[in-house]
Amino acid sequence: MPVQGSQRRLLGSLNSTPTATPHLGLAANQTGARCLEMSIPDGLFLSLGLVSLVENVLVVTAIAKNRNLHSPMYCFICCLALSDLLVSGSNMLETAVTLLLEAGALAARAAVVQQLDNVIDVITCSSMLSSLCFLGAIAVDRYISIFYALRYHSIVTLPRARRAIAAIWVASVLCSTLFIAYYDHAAVLLCLVVFFLAMLVLMAVLYVHMLARACQHAQGIARLHKRQRLAHQGFGLKGAATLTILLGIFFLCWGPFFLHLTLIVLCPQHPTCSCIFKNFNLFLTLIICNAIIDPLIYAFRSQELRRTLKEVLLCSW
């Protein structure tokens, strides 16, 4: 967290462009070429972070309160919410402290600021990695529940889920510490990109296979009841649309950030790449947006969780 300028060293010094006055327009890069630069107002960034924070706190609270939600599936959803909560909270904290330093409202020695920056960077990076891991874990859990339905409760037990969760958190913290320490090495950035692509491929393969199985099942039912063919076609279209939305949101929110990392390795000095680097804060904002959307996709669709959430909100009043 540099004392001057609101650039983030988080995932490091990945972006060397300080945040300018919020605008959307053409800006000149170092070579004189003109490119589109979109700076995100700090107020908007903090507001989105706050929405994500509240949403995910509600999810974690509801799952913790209701013992019926202490199954492996909801444990993964709870950990996803906790990861998204940390992503939003750490970015909000970094932005807020940076604004206070710039305004002169907060005085701190450079060494203290550097230590705080390192801690926030590790929290942010580890929560991003764990968020991706738990998205993959949820996909695997759903895949097993469909293809191994009869053996699901013997395969995905609560102790195994807890061990998997512990392994994900430990691995995320260790890897993020190494990534932050060696952020200026191309191999580190490539590892992050490969990890993202692996999660994308894993989710795509599992969800496409699940959709194919569901369509196959619906087709079998339609053969027994010929009148239901139109319903089967509608089911296939609805399933395809749901899958497209799920994977599309994942790619749209996370893809630009990892494209940014890829271009740092491939073309750090190219004018076109320099234009993309200027939108680093936009890419972070998209990740915050993903943290807002995740509860809507994975948590709030559960009737039991929504009922518990209503009880929590009513009790708070």
From Swiss-Prot:
Name recorded for this polypeptide: Melanocyte-stimulating hormone receptor
Compartment(s) of residence: Cell membrane
PROSITE patterns linked: G_PROTEIN_RECEP_F1_1, G_PROTEIN_RECEP_F1_2
TM regions (residue ranges): 38-63, 73-93, 119-140, 164-183, 192-211, 241-266, 280-300
Domain of life: Eukaryota
Encoding gene per record: MC1R
Annotated keywords: Cell membrane, G-protein coupled receptor, Glycoprotein, Lipoprotein, Membrane, Palmitate, Receptor, Transducer, Transmembrane, Transmembrane helix
Residue intervals on the Extracellular side: 1-37, 94-118, 184-191, 267-279
Pfam families: 7tm_1
Molecular functions (GO terms): melanocyte-stimulating hormone receptor activity
GO terms under biological process: adenylate cyclase-activating G protein-coupled receptor signaling pathway
CDD domains recorded: 7tmA_MC1R (cd15351)
Subunit details: Interacts with MGRN1, but does not undergo MGRN1-mediated ubiquitination; this interaction competes with GNAS-binding and thus inhibits agonist-induced cAMP production. Interacts with OPN3; the interaction results in a decrease in MC1R-mediated cAMP signaling and ultimately a decrease in melanin production in melanocytes.
Organism, scientific name: Macaca nemestrina
Recorded GO CC terms: plasma membrane
Glycosylated residue positions: N29
InterPro entries xrefs: GPCR_Rhodpsn, GPCR_Rhodpsn_7TM, Melcrt_ACTH_rcpt, MSH_rcpt
Membrane topology term: Multi-pass membrane protein
Residues carrying lipid (S-palmitoyl cysteine): C315
Ranges of the Cytoplasmic topological domain: 64-72, 141-163, 212-240, 301-317
Function: Receptor for MSH (alpha, beta and gamma) and ACTH. The activity of this receptor is mediated by G proteins which activate adenylate cyclase. Mediates melanogenesis, the production of eumelanin (black/brown) and phaeomelanin (red/yellow), via regulation of cAMP signaling in melanocytes.
SUPFAM superfamilies named in the record: Family A G protein-coupled receptor-like
Similarity comment text for this entry: Belongs to the G-protein coupled receptor 1 family.
